[in-house]
Amino acid sequence: MIPQIYLRKGKEESLLRRHPWIFSGAIDHIKAEEESDFAEGALVEVYTRQGEFMALGHYQVGSIAVRVLTFEREEIDQAWWNLRIAVAYDVRRTLDLTDNPATTCYRLVHGEGDSLPGLVVDIYGPVAVIQCHSAGMYHARMQIAEALRTVYGARLTAIYDKSSQTLPFKAALGAVDGYLWGTSDHASHIVLENGERFCVNWEKGQKTGFFLDQRENRQLVKRYAKGRTVLNTFCYTGGFSVYALSGGAGEVCSVDSSERAVALATENMQLNFGDNAAHSEVAADAVDYLKDIGDKYDLIILDPPAFAKHHKVLGNAMQGYQRLNARALSQIRPGGILFTFSCSQAVTKELFRTTVFSAAAIAGRKVRILHQLTQPADHPINIYHPEGEYLKGLVLYVE
């Protein structure tokens, strides 16, 4: 028997609105034949207090107790996984990503946005990289791999599981990164994004190897870069830097605290422009570097890592965003363009914009909003799960 979770009275309201999370405080009691049936990552049925079926999902110890896979009574077998991956693939085909010679890397599965909470799958040419954020998805990884093989066929040569850093440590699953199927001669692979070339290392790189969620925003940087002197902070692999130089920037400087990241940015510059690119790199803390940059730059990119992964640290995080933006706004040349981002799920669009407004006031600059940015369409947002809109950005014109 599949373990059954019964909700407290009235706690089914979010499920009636098709929200895919059930919080631990909503649970009244649990029925299971054996305690072992109710292990971390187990498939569970969810019922109202009165015994009305509501959903099937993966159980996990923690604040989010159940991640809903379906609101229907259905068997979660190989055919189910094949269908879910096929539906995600069809969405990307609609977006002209699956057979696009100019873009060979994209996100295939984006968790709740594709009704597969706890799962990320990114495609890098012939290699699929899986990251499981829940124990339930980790237990299903071989079924997921089989579904990927079914959907992609011979176009896929390897499937790499990179879940060791994304699984909850309390689950104690002993996950080890490695190939679930196939192999690759090299852990690095050259991919195309809007015609720009990037070397991606899914084994050693951050996330799955590349930040795919900035694809469209990088293209916008390219549009504004012509003739400008560009500073790309928190550069990682230099994605924004490559696009800026491709767009005709006069000079680009890439800054990151990681020497390895700076080396990757340089490698990608050489890959696209050879050894004579008008590019410099600095291994330094970006916040400290911005203390005194003078008026050299007229296009600055601020794309920091998440300052607030939890609401408990939100106050300190917003102070950090304010300080970072104030430093850039106070020193950017008149007529300059600032691209500023937050990837913190806990930071709403309204809060981020208010914080940037206060930074502009501190800097004493007249500022216009030119664009309000978000994640691309291959990182879709489940309309019933607004928390999925994690990336927010502003493009500012600074007088």
Each predicted region: which residue ranges?
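Conserved class I S-adenosyl-L-methionine
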Residues: G227-Y236
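C-terminal catalytic and target-recognition region of SAM-dependent MTase-like enzymes
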Residues: I337-E399
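Conserved SAM-binding motif I beta-strand of class I
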Residues: E251-D256
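Non-catalytic accessory regions of SAM-dependent methyltransferases
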Residues: M1-I123
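Conserved SAM-binding loop of SAM-dependent methyltransferases across substrates and taxa
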Residues: T237-G250
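S-adenosyl-L-methionine
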Residues: R260-I301
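Non-catalytic substrate-recognition/targeting regions of SAM-dependent transferases
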Residues: V109-D122, Y138-F210, Q219
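Mobile active-site "lid"/loop adjacent to the S-adenosyl-L-methionine
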Residues: Y297-R327
